[in-house]
Amino acid sequence: MLLIGVAGTTLSAQEVDWLQDDAVAGVVLFKRNFASRAQIVELSAALREAAPRPLLLAVDQEGGRVQRFYEGYSALPPLQGIGALYVRDPEAALELAFEHAWLMASEVRASGVDLSFAPVVDLGRGNRAIGDRAFSDDPHVVAAFAQAYVQGMHAAGMPVTLKHFPGHGSVLEDTHVDLAVDVRPLETLESEDLVPFAAGIAAGADAVMMAHVVYPNVAPETAGFSAHWIEVILRGRMGFRGVVFSDDIGMAAVRGVGGVVGCVHAHLDAGCDVVLVCHPELVNDALSAVAGRRSNTAALIGLIGRGALGWDGLLADVRYGSIQSRLFERFGTST
């Protein structure tokens, strides 16, 4: 199955045609799709109306520099700021993480979008792509935050996606533009990078997004291409039973693996449930790749639309203004 990207703030005839294909499980929204809060509500409704089946709508709304919806939404602080508070006041930091998660998830759901791919539970160890998106460099601190964030998102009625498994934070390279290789053995990864994922899974995380990183002392392929990582370690040893997403196949770290068709097949053959095709110019090739493959749409049913929530209802919720105020007082963020 595929989650695809669309080009703009309204749907083209070709994009409506893509949505008729059984292989299209949903749409990932980006800043290019955003003009205003009202427009996102309209686009979400138009996407659902155009599709002949339930459609999963997703976005990256982490806070900080990765926030696709902005005007009319809370300016969420990056997770690193919340992590820094943990040293002084762990209880207050974990409460803020819960509230950050609730606020983010509530605003996204009020816009008609099912989920934000969050939280990042990579370790903050200097990776160019992760940076301040990570809570901390300490696996056990990140594990505590992972559990609080899962609880906050679930309290808002949103499913949770832990990313980027098995950990993107301990390599320097940004997989958007480079191949990344982590040469540490599995024993080290299990005692460090996998700790937050185990905590998030234990807390009830619904999905995991794979990293486009190679761990050659565990498996020769990037993690998203690796049945060993997905089936043996994630589903086998760690007992994860939820949805497995690839990261975007347009990223440089996987671009050379058999083109779009080869990349899609490699992810699905390894055990990914859903492949992200975020660049519209790659969608036709991706659809050609999955023609004839069986689509397991049941895997995503639990991620779609957990009850109705609109902006009027959210704005009337007393928690909304109070949480915004607390985050503003601590980090200077606002709408």
From Swiss-Prot:
It holds the Pfam family Glyco_hydro_3. Substrate binds at residues 60, 68, 133, 163-164. The keyword Hydrolase applies. The keyword rRNA-binding does not apply. It is found in: Cytoplasm. Pathway: Cell wall biogenesis; peptidoglycan recycling. The active site is at residues 176, 247. The record marks 174 as: Important for catalytic activity. One of its GO terms (molecular function) is beta-N-acetylhexosaminidase activity. Coiled coil: none annotated. It is an enzyme of class 3 (hydrolase). Belongs to the glycosyl hydrolase 3 family. NagZ subfamily. This is Beta-hexosaminidase. The lineage of its organism: Bacteria, Pseudomonadati, Pseudomonadota, Gammaproteobacteria, Lysobacterales.
